[in-house]
Amino acid sequence: MASIQNLYETVVGVLGDQASKVISALGEITVECLPEHYISVMTALRDHEELHFELLVDLCGVDYSTYKNEVWQGKRFAVVSQLLSVKNNQRIRVRVWVSDDDFPVVESVVDIYNSADWYEREAFDMYGIMFNNHPDLRRILTDYGFVGHPFRKDFPISGYVEMRYDEEQKRVIYQPVTIEPREITPRIVREENYGGQ
């Protein structure tokens, strides 16, 4: 655990006021920062000679609106990045809270980490988080005409539309979802001597 403590102290020393919070828990370091410091934090983590987090392993959006089965009191959306230092064999997590819940926007880190390209597109597609200065921010997993963002917690489980092939038109069409919710009542069977004898 000494290396985690050393990493924690180094990160706190390097980032200073740019990090709003540095958390060391369960053998992992998490850096939380505001959107205005996101680019400088990511650049410092990559370029500082003692840190050298040269690889972005993952980036995802998170909707905290009902975190831990309660109504969340803070910002609704965050972008979470997982960084790896191959040189030092260490990992770190960076969480940036998005300022506006209605129109979530954060700066793109594609210029710092090339691997962020498709991850940011996925976060945009699934959560509706916009990434400023992204070179090609468009949907990556859903159709271009898709309405909404399916990983948001307020998105209906069955969606809004379904697609099917129309024989008359000889093409795929969209139509409102025809799934009807049903109530399932469990059937209880009680028999004498059930379970053997």
Swiss-Prot record:
Cell compartments where the protein resides: Cell inner membrane
GO cellular component terms attached to this protein's record: plasma membrane
Catalytic activity: a quinone + NADH + 5 H(+)(in) = a quinol + NAD(+) + 4 H(+)(out)
Broad class of the protein's primary localization: membrane
Leading EC class: translocase
Short name of one Pfam family: Complex1_30kDa
Sample GO molecular function, one term: quinone binding
Database matches in InterPro entries: NADH_DH_suC (IPR010218), NADH_quin_OxRdtase_su_C/D-like (IPR037232), NADH_UbQ_OxRdtase_30kDa_su (IPR001268), NADH_UbQ_OxRdtase_CS (IPR020396)
Entry membrane topology: Peripheral membrane protein
Gene3D superfamilies cross-referenced by the UniProt entry: NADH:ubiquinone oxidoreductase, 30kDa subunit
Function: NDH-1 shuttles electrons from NADH, via FMN and iron-sulfur (Fe-S) centers, to quinones in the respiratory chain. The immediate electron acceptor for the enzyme in this species is believed to be ubiquinone. Couples the redox reaction to proton translocation (for every two electrons transferred, four hydrogen ions are translocated across the cytoplasmic membrane), and thus conserves the redox energy in a proton gradient.
Quaternary data: NDH-1 is composed of 14 different subunits. Subunits NuoB, C, D, E, F, and G constitute the peripheral sector of the complex.
Stated family: Belongs to the complex I 30 kDa subunit family.
Name assigned to this protein: NADH-quinone oxidoreductase subunit C
